[in-house]
């Protein structure tokens, strides 16, 4: 082999060996940069898990492999210690490996049964009994509504497990006919039951990841299928988290708009002012006024409201109402005369029905 070809072969061999040692590129699998936050990683997993789930891709022979790669990537990058080891040494550097069930990871985001991939929750068979649904109010802050977030909820869930012995199940009413004599029959209603393996309810701790989407509205529900009350003869019900947006000390929400009040001094109301308002994510909204600002005056800052739930690229407005803080001390006679001379404004005393707009 020529020296040049030998060198090329050696470089190719070293590259292949390095690739094998490094293992899978978990950042590429999730489609996030190496600087991604834990929220970015969770958001990417949740989106891709729905797209790559094997039940949604029955014609893809690699669907199961892709889904497993996605679960492995999330398991490592969502754990700070595993992520640190992976960033330093690659996949082979992980001490204890990553052997969690990727179905378990999926259920943390969607529940035991996930979604029917036609876009609707699971279809109910009316002949199969199911446990009660559970609705839980989940309080979220206005900051979370603005930027989105993932909330971890730890739930002690009763789960049906097999136990020794047998039990009666699927009990139902049936009509029985008994012949009493020639041409005489008696019909009675009896309870008939099947015999099933015995079960017992065991509490198991589950961690659920609830995604608070930007612009989420008060009262919206996030379902976790199969996470409700169990039924020993059928399916468990669903767990639904109902969003409850808590009141904010500075901003009030009305649709996609935000409202707030700003108090300025009498001097500022007359000569103008500059100030910044700290928004929900920490960025500054600058306000500059070089003209008279009357009490009750409003200022609209377009695009500084909340993101629209259906289209996060659209944002509402921030509406600012100004209050004027008048001096607390009484003015001296000299100060009064000075103000009169400065403003040169005569008496304006008008009585009218302000509520009707006259």
UniProtKB/Swiss-Prot annotation:
Stored Pfam families: DnaJ (PF00226), DnaJ_C (PF01556)
Single GO biological process annotation from the record: protein folding
PTM annotation, UniProt: Contains high-mannose Endo H-sensitive carbohydrates. Cys-169, Cys-171, Cys-193 and Cys-196 form intramolecular disulfide bonds. The preferential partner for each Cys is not known.
Compartments, record wording: Endoplasmic reticulum lumen
Any one of the GO CC terms: endoplasmic reticulum lumen
Main localization, broad class: endoplasmic reticulum
GO molecular function annotation: misfolded protein binding; unfolded protein binding
PROSITE patterns (alphabetical): DNAJ_1, DNAJ_2
Domain of life: Eukaryota
Modified residues (Phosphothreonine): 188
Keywords on record: Chaperone, Disulfide bond, Endoplasmic reticulum, Glycoprotein, Phosphoprotein, Signal
Domain annotation J: ranges: 25-90
Keyword Magnesium attached: no
Glycan attachment points: 261
Record text on subunit structure and interactions: Part of a large chaperone multiprotein complex comprising DNAJB11, HSP90B1, HSPA5, HYOU, PDIA2, PDIA4, PDIA6, PPIB, SDF2L1, UGGT1 and very small amounts of ERP29, but not, or at very low levels, CALR nor CANX. Binds to denatured substrates in an ATP-independent manner. Interacts via the J domain with HSPA5 in an ATP-dependent manner.
Function recorded in the entry: As a co-chaperone for HSPA5 it is required for proper folding, trafficking or degradation of proteins. Binds directly to both unfolded proteins that are substrates for ERAD and nascent unfolded peptide chains, but dissociates from the HSPA5-unfolded protein complex before folding is completed. May help recruiting HSPA5 and other chaperones to the substrate. Stimulates HSPA5 ATPase activity. It is necessary for maturation and correct trafficking of PKD1.
Listed name of the protein: DnaJ homolog subfamily B member 11
Annotated organism of origin: Bos taurus
């Amino acid at each position: 082999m020529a020296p040049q070809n030998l060198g090329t072969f050696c470089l190719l061999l070293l590259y292949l060996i390095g690739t094998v040692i490094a293992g899978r590129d978990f950042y590429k699998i999730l489609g996030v940069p190496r600087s991604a936050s834990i929220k970015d990683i969770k958001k990417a997993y949740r989106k891709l898990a729905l797209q790559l789930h094997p039940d949604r891709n029955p014609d893809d022979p690699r669907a199961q492999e892709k889904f497993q790669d996605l679960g492995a990537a999330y398991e490592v990058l969502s754990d700070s210690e595993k992520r640190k080891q992976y960033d330093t040494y690659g996949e082979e550097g992980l001490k204890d490996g990553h052997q969690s069930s990727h179905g378990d990871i999926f259920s943390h985001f969607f529940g035991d049964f996930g979604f029917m991939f036609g876009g609707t929750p699971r279809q109910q068979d009316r002949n199969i009994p199911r446990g009660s649904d559970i609705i839980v109010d989940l309080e979220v802050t206005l900051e979370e509504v603005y930027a989105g977030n993932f909330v971890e909820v730890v739930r002690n869930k009763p789960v049906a497990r097999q136990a020794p012995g047998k039990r009666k199940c699927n009990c139902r009413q049936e009509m029985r006919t008994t012949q009493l004599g020639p041409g005489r029959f008696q019909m009675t209603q009896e309870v008939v039951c099947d015999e099933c393996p015995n079960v017992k309810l065991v509490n198991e701790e589950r961690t659920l990841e609830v995604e608070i989407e930007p612009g989420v509205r008060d009262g919206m529900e996030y379902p976790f299928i199969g996470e409700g009350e169990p039924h020993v003869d059928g399916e468990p019900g669903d767990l639904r988290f109902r969003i409850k947006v808590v009141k904010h000390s500075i901003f009030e929400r009305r649709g996609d708009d935000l409202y707030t009040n700003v108090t300025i001094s009498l001097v500022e109301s007359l000569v103008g002012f500059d100030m910044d308002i700290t928004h929900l994510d920490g960025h500054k909204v600058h306000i500059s006024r070089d003209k008279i600002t009357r009490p009750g005056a409003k200022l609209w800052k377009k695009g500084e409201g909340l993101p629209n739930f259906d289209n996060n690229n659209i944002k509402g407005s921030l509406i600012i109402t100004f209050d004027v803080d008048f001096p607390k001390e009484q003015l001296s006679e000299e100060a009064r005369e000075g103000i009169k001379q400065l403003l040169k404004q005569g008496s304006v005393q008008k009585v009218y029905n302000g509520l009707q707009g006259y």
